[in-house]
Amino acid sequence: EGAEKVGYQTIVIGGVRDPYILRQLDSWLVTGEANIHKRIYDVYGDSISRDDYVFNIRVYGRDGVMGPLEPQKELTTHEVCLILEATAATQEIATSIATVARHKILHEPIPEWSGLITGLACTYSPAHIERGAVFRFNVNHVVEPDDPYEMFPIEYMNVN
């Protein structure tokens, strides 16, 4: 197995409990993420492009562990935990992206409410957590040796 550095990461952990948001969670997240990317462009222009970072929202309490492979498709909880993940070439960019993302999703509107809403309860203050360098697996080896011992040579020594 092998690992490679993919960049630096900053996360934000928060909960959503508003029943109006939970009823439309998927569309709220899609709109919210689009607004996050738009706001990043509005703030940073061409100095940070979409190719400079990876942004993910994990939803624990729905499919945070298995993602699209989750067999239980219906949301049956009264709250979910969102983890906003920003990964970039530098810690500074990752933290900037996470900070913008937190603010945008915190106040992402829904049709049932007018004016400014707060839809995300952040667990920590400051809300962003710098994780430092992050890695992913990049190699898996499959070997079929002729002899099961050939990959693990044994050397015997006589010690007096």
Cite the ranges covered by each PLM segment.
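C-terminal non-catalytic interaction/assembly regions of soluble proteins
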Residues: 2-160
